[in-house]
Regions:
Chain A
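Aromatic- and glycine-rich beta-strand/loop motifs that create alpha-glucan
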Residues: 1-28
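Hydrophobic alpha-helical transmembrane segments of multi-pass membrane transport/permease proteins
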Residues: 25-47, 63-65, 171, 175-182, ...
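Membrane-interfacial helix-loop-helix connectors in multipass membrane proteins
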Residues: 45-56, 120-141, 186-202, 225-227
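Long, hydrophobic alpha-helical segments
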Residues: 57-73, 77
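Transmembrane helix boundary and interhelical loop/hinge segments in multi-pass membrane proteins
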Residues: 70-90
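A structural motif at transmembrane helix-loop-helix junctions in multipass membrane proteins
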Residues: 134, 139-173, 223-228
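Junction motif at the cytosolic side of a transmembrane helix
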Residues: 211-228
Length: 228, 211
């Protein structure tokens, strides 16, 4: 029996998740509003002194975006597990890892991309110099998919447990440390006029590794979660 | 049980048993299912009907005994796409319409040449409700929105867990009609049911589950 074309299956799944996210666009706005509010709190807490804010701007934006992504993370596979869609996906004659990669991509597009879009606004509020802005965006473009992929593994691993939201945060945040170090390192290097390519290259390398391995790990973890 | 038929049975279980934390769920169970054969899996609540179907679908691993698919040792990849599993969770997205849900299923599993999606939705009794979000449909209509996959997706073995639940009399007849048509073109199906339903009219093959 001929299997349905892979591209059509990928497109069908990606389209489904994007349409679902669009029909619940209120959920997309939530992490964005959260990031906006958190970033606004810093000048209130630390005072509006421009030199101080300028120094912490890059790090604050990165951590804020990371925390905002965490909010939406545990919903990545939850709906599919609850309504049986995941069973149908696992049993489909398609490579499960690739299908899950599509789901992770859809999740990144609906949660991380809006955050990246408002990142210049957040950075501007904190007086990040314009010269460092492209580096911040580049670092976010590499760091957020990395977080989505790492998060997806943990979501898949905790899929069987109830109330996994807090557990997920506790497991993911330590893994975020190197991502934050490299991303914030690149931004602060750019702010000081130093070469920033090396930390960005590290992020890129980690992303390449995660792109290949994370969907495979997700597939294995979700199979185990269903086999229980 | 003949050991060497001209064509091996589609599915064969030998001394299949399943344990959950060392508690036996069912088994040992022996049965064969040939192409064109429909069997009713019977048993009380908790007798392991759903577990059996999940094993045969490949969602649970075989703990004990042997499972053969088309005469060869069962392998997950060999039967993917040739098996259609319909469980308690229908695998429908509430925010999508029946038509959109069906399009996703067809994208993943492929589809038969006949009928087209619109025709399939009409035949399953969802005419006029194709574009309604599934969460607004009644329980019976949701079931039909899931059953419409049977019409469209090209699987040989159907594993249907309680397909009659929530269906009205015409719905039950519809499922029976689908099963008869499927058997006539060489498909096979395992159907679980805990209640007395007018299954295919005649006297079907029965697989009795014991806890």
């Amino acid at each position: 029996m001929s299997r349905p074309p892979l591209a059509a299956a990928c497109a069908a799944l990606l389209r489904r998740d994007l349409v679902l996210a669009w029909r619940r666009r209120g959920d997309i706005a939530m992490p964005v509003l959260y990031a906006l509010i958190v970033a606004t709190l810093f000048p209130f807490a630390l005072g509006p002194e421009e030199a101080l804010l300028q120094r912490i701007a890059g790090g604050v934006v990165l951590v804020t975006v990371l925390l905002a992504m965490l909010l939406a993370l545990d919903a990545m596979f939850r709906g599919d597990i609850e309504d049986g869609s995941l069973e149908q996906l696992v049993l489909a004659p398609q490579p499960l890892a690739l299908m899950l990669a599509m789901k992770i991509l859809a999740h990144w597009i609906t949660t991380a991309l809006p955050l990246i879009v408002i990142a210049p606004l957040l950075a501007g509020m904190l007086h990040l110099p314009g010269a460092a802005m492209p580096v911040l965006l580049l670092a976010l473009l590499l760091a957020t998919p990395l977080l989505s992929l790492l998060g997806a593994i943990l979501v898949a691993l905790t899929a069987g447990t109830r109330r996994s939201g807090m557990l997920l945060a506790l497991m993911l945040l330590p893994l975020c440390v190197p991502v934050v170090i490299f991303a914030a390192g690149a931004v602060s290097a750019a702010q000081q006029g130093l070469p920033w390519l090396a930390p960005v290259a590290w992020l890129g390398a980690a992303l390449a590794l995660a792109l290949v391995l994370a969907p495979l790990a997700c597939a294995a973890a979700l199979r185990i979660a269903l086999d229980a | 049980m003949t050991a060497s038929p001209a064509r091996p049975a589609l599915l064969e279980a030998r001394a299949l048993a399943f344990y959950r934390q060392d508690e036996p769920v069912f088994g040992p169970l022996d049965f064969q299912l040939a192409e064109g054969e429909i069997a009713l899996v019977e048993g009380d609540n908790g007798s392991g009907k759903t577990t059996l179907l999940r094993i045969l679908a490949g969602l649970l691993h075989v703990e004990e005994g042997e499972l053969r698919w088309r005469g060869e040792a069962w392998q997950r990849d060999a039967q993917l796409g040739d098996v259609l599993f319909l469980g308690h969770h229908l695998g429908l997205k509430g925010d999508l319409s029946a038509r959109e849900n069906l399009a996703v299923a067809a994208g993943l599993y492929g589809r038969r040449d006949e009928p087209g999606p619109a025709d399939a939705l009409r035949r399953i009794g969802l005419a006029g409700y194709e574009d309604e979000p599934v969460r607004r449909l009644s329980a019976g209509q949701k079931k039909r929105a899931a059953l419409v996959r049977l019409l469209l997706l090209p699987a040989t073995l159907w594993l249907l867990d309680e397909p009659y639940a929530n269906l009205d009399r015409t719905g039950i007849e519809l499922v029976n009609g689908l099963l008869a048509q499927h058997a006539a073109r060489g498909g096979a199906a395992l159907v679980t049911s805990h209640g007395a339903v007018s299954f295919l009219g005649g006297e079907p093959r029965r697989i009795r589950m014991h806890a």
